[in-house]
Regions:
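Mid-chain, well-packed structural core segment of small domains
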Residues: 66-99
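Interfacial loop-to-transmembrane junctions
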Residues: 99-123
Length: 139
């Protein structure tokens, strides 16, 4: 495994963010075209139609917990601590974000979203633990 393998789950997550921006644009455009919203409503996110609201909320979620994901991946990369286990767990986190986002922009059922969030959160905790152990070993 190369030292750059930890960067691929980060790239995958960035792809999700791009896809969610595109989906948000499509859903907002459809809402305006259908007369369910005016463009001016989106300036301050007032009374957003449900379809685009779910996409907007899912996009917003990508700038919460995942920020810590990108930081820990970069720290593992910079300290040469991105072994096979760390890369596998990083992929688990990225996959959990895709599942979470898919549920968020479709049914938006908490009982389906929560397990994906929990899996990602556990993966993130594991990555930070791996970084801490790695730093203790190289100190």
């Amino acid at each position: 495994m190369t030292g750059t393998a930890i960067l691929w789950p980060m790239i995958a997550h960035a792809g999700l963010v791009v896809a969610l921006y595109a989906l948000l644009g499509l859903r907002r455009g459809a809402a305006v075209k259908a007369g369910k919203a005016r463009v001016s409503q989106f300036r301050e996110n007032l009374n957003e139609p449900e379809d685009s609201l779910f996409a907007r909320n899912s996009l917003s979620n990508q700038f919460e917990l995942p920020v810590l994901f990108h930081v820990v991946c970069l720290a593992l990369f910079a300290t040469d601590g991105a072994g096979a286990w760390a890369v596998a767990v990083a992929w688990l986190f990225a996959a959990s974000r895709y599942v979470h986002a898919f549920v968020h922009v479709t049914s938006n059922r908490i009982r389906h979203r929560q397990p994906a969030f929990t899996a990602g959160f556990a993966a993130l905790i594991a990555l930070w633990g791996m970084l801490a152990v790695h730093l203790l070993r190289i100190a």
